[in-house]
């Protein structure tokens, strides 16, 4: 493995640390019904803000971008950069924020593995719970067949955002959801979503052109955690990881030796 390949390995390790680990505030209000569908209130909620909670930095970023220019929205992030969502345990303040929220935006596909029971309870309270991965799953673009535990088998890889085309689906879907919840500001949501989504195809094409310049037999990516299957499928790279799909998986001696053997062989 030459220095250039090593640099690629280190760069992706850093990206994994941040991504598996956000900024436009203020928006208009919607009153959620018992089923979780929103009806626009008289401009704003009684307390003057439509409160959104975003679990991950990705959720926080897209929420801020899509709500830019809409008054009276408060967006609260739960996890900072570098926080691992696989292992993150909601704190008392997190639970309080979600209980007070009108909408919670999360990644889904078991990325936030410790949140499922909380989300179920929030839905019963009428809080809008939006999974960013839903349009990717519904479109048939997830990579599946993984086993997380004895109970969770044949599950999908939750790291869907490493293919920009999947993120475009997320942007469009969330923009439509916000517009439906808050029709008074639907044009702003639509314009923000259209502008942001339009960046994804050029990003994919730029990355695809550059990454495929590496000879096919040398497109190997070694990471500590198996988070790049979507990247590999999108850009024609072979993945090798010490840990499995979730960082809850413990790497054994055999896993480490297998990775060492892979590096030596390639």
At which residue positions do the language-model features occur?
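Bacterial N-terminal signal peptides
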Residues: 9-17
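Bacterial N-terminal signal peptides that target proteins for export
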Residues: 1-9
């Amino acid at each position: 493995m030459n220095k250039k390949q090593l640099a690629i390995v280190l760069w992706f390790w850093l990206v994994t640390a941040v991504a598996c680990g956000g900024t436009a505030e203020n928006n208009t209000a919607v009153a959620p019904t018992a089923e979780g569908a929103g009806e626009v209130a008289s401009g704003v909620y009684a307390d003057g803000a439509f409160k959104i909670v975003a679990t991950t930095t990705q959720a926080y970023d897209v929420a801020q971008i899509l709500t830019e220019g809409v008054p009276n929205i408060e967006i609260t992030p739960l996890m900072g950069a570098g926080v691992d969502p696989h292992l993150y345990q909601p704190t008392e303040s997190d639970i309080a924020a979600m209980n007070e929220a009108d909408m919670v935006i999360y990644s889904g596909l078991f990325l936030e593995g410790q949140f499922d029971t909380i989300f179920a309870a929030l839905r019963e309270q009428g809080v809008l719970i939006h999974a960013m991965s839903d349009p990717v799953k519904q479109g048939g673009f997830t990579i599946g067949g993984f086993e997380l535990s004895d109970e969770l088998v044949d599950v999908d890889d939750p790291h869907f955002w490493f293919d920009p085309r999947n993120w475009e689906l997320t942007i469009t879907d969330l923009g439509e959801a916000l517009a439906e919840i808050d029709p008074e500001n639907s044009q702003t949501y639509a314009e923000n979503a259209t502008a942001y989504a339009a960046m994804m195809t050029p990003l994919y094409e730029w990355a695809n052109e550059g990454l495929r310049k590496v000879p096919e037999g040398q497109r190997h990516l070694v990471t500590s955690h198996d988070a790049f299957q979507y990247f590999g499928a999108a850009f024609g790279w072979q993945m090798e990881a010490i840990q499995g799909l979730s960082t809850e998986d413990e790497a054994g001696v055999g896993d480490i030796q297998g990775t060492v053997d892979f590096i030596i062989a390639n």
